[in-house]
């Protein structure tokens, strides 16, 4: 028996045929399916094709296949490889996961960024994310004093 297929259309005009059961991991898409708005495909105005490919890859991996369950350990290893991406791609995935309302992908991408920050000094964080320090030394000192609890 073949699964029902739906078409997802990226913001740059690419079309992707995906199993409905895989695509509805996105609450945004699930609501469109419920409202029967999928006949002509689902336009995803905020998601480029290179990011949609990654989202589909993630959803396919996380689609629950009762016949072939995946262990949590294997999923964690897969997640680690999946998130081995350029920063800009991770940020675009965060935006896509938020727009598509895929909580598990949103959590994974945000945790990846949190792990990039964990244990770093403000200077290291600025360097990692190319953030310009536009505080004067006096302003920076005032912020540090205000938030001393965070540095303990």
UniProtKB/Swiss-Prot annotation:
Presence of the UniProt keyword Transcription in the record: no
Signal peptide: none
Gene Ontology cellular component list: nucleus; SCF ubiquitin ligase complex
Pfam name, any one: Skp1
Region (Interaction with the F-box domain of F-box proteins): 94-152
Pathway of action: Protein modification; protein ubiquitination
Stretches of the chain forming a coiled coil according to its record: none
GO biological process: auxin-activated signaling pathway; jasmonic acid mediated signaling pathway; protein ubiquitination; response to auxin; response to jasmonic acid; ubiquitin-dependent protein catabolic process
Gene3D superfamilies, sorted: Potassium Channel Kv1.1, Chain A (3.30.710.10)
Subcellular location: Nucleus
Keywords assigned by UniProt, alphabetized: Nucleus, Ubl conjugation pathway
Tissue note: Expressed in young seedlings, roots, leaves, floral stems, inflorescences, and siliques, with a slightly higher level in inflorescence than in other tissues.
Entry function: Involved in ubiquitination and subsequent proteasomal degradation of target proteins. Together with CUL1, RBX1 and a F-box protein, it forms a SCF E3 ubiquitin ligase complex. The functional specificity of this complex depends on the type of F-box protein. In the SCF complex, it serves as an adapter that links the F-box protein to CUL1. Plays a role during early flowers reproductive development.
Family of the protein in this entry: Belongs to the SKP1 family.
Subunit composition and interactions: Part of a SCF (SKP1-cullin-F-box) protein ligase complex. Interacts with ADO3/FKF1, COI1/FBL2, EBF1/FBL6, PP2B10, At3g61590 and At5g49610.
Protein name in UniProt: SKP1-like protein 12
Gene (name only): ASK12
